[in-house]
A protein has these predicted regions:
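Gly/Ala-rich beta-loop-alpha elbow adjacent to hydrolase catalytic centers
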Residues: 77-81, 85
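Flexible "cap/lid" loop of the alpha/beta hydrolase fold
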Residues: 90, 96-129
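Conserved HGGG/HGGXW glycine-rich cap/lid loop of the alpha/beta-hydrolase fold
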Residues: 1-46
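Active-site signature of alpha/beta-hydrolase-fold catalytic machinery across serine-
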Residues: 19, 87-91
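Structural signature of beta-strand start/N-cap positions in the alpha/beta core
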Residues: 3, 32, 72-74, 95-98
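Active-site micro-motifs of SAM-dependent methyltransferase domains
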Residues: 12, 40, 82, 106-107
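Active-site loop/oxyanion-hole signature of alpha/beta-hydrolase fold enzymes
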Residues: 32-76
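Conserved alpha/beta-hydrolase catalytic His-Asp/Glu region
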Residues: 112, 131-178
Length: 178
């Protein structure tokens, strides 16, 4: 049986996959699909986020071992999660069968100020330093990351619920960003 690990990005958690995780499982009924949270996010929101991508890889490997999920893995990863997936494949290639990387940028090739559009700096810095309501944060994230026409209220409502249940601290957001 193939095992697919889903990894999200900056301040996102497993629930941010929304319907995609279930659709992915439906498309691959013989596979095991695990949506994993990085430390500082989701069910692990109370933990400090590692300061390095290598630390995030170590945390993912430890969490999967704790759950009894054994390699080899296929990784489907987005943004920061794709950076984690790439490092994982580089440092433990015997554990990884393949990677699907979405919306990624790599720290060694582009510093954080190149990975984000300059016009979004002020909005993102405001979210980190003076977080507004969960609703305002998620609407801003939607506006900055989606080209879908108009807000998708159900998706944003799900994101708000996740942020309210398992808030990401400002310090963890910064630790993930730099």
């Amino acid at each position: 049986m193939d095992t697919w690990i889903l990894l999200r990005g900056l301040t996102r958690e497993a629930s941010h996959w929304g319907a995609f995780a279930g659709d992915f499982q439906t498309a691959l009924p013989q596979a095991k699909v695990v949506a994993l949270d990085l430390p500082g996010n989701g069910q692990l929101h109370a933990l400090p986020s590692p300061l390095t991508v290598q630390g995030m890889v170590a945390a993912c490997r430890a969490e999967l071992a704790r759950q009894g999920v054994l390699p080899p893995f296929h990784l489907f990863a987005m943004s920061l999660g794709a950076m984690v997936a790439t490092e994982w494949a580089r440092t433990a290639p015997e554990e990884i069968r393949g990677c699907v990387l979405v919306n990624t940028s790599f720290r060694p090739f582009s510093p954080f100020f190149h990975r984000l559009r300059p016009r979004n700096y002020a909005a993102l810095l405001g979210l980190v330093l003076h977080p507004p309501s969960a609703d305002a944060i998620e609407r801003t994230v939607w506006r900055l990351t989606s080209n879908a026409p108009g807000p998708r209220t159900a998706v944003i409502d799900d994101w708000v619920a996740a942020r309210t249940r398992r808030p990401v601290s400002a310090i963890n957001a910064l630790r993930q960003l730099v």
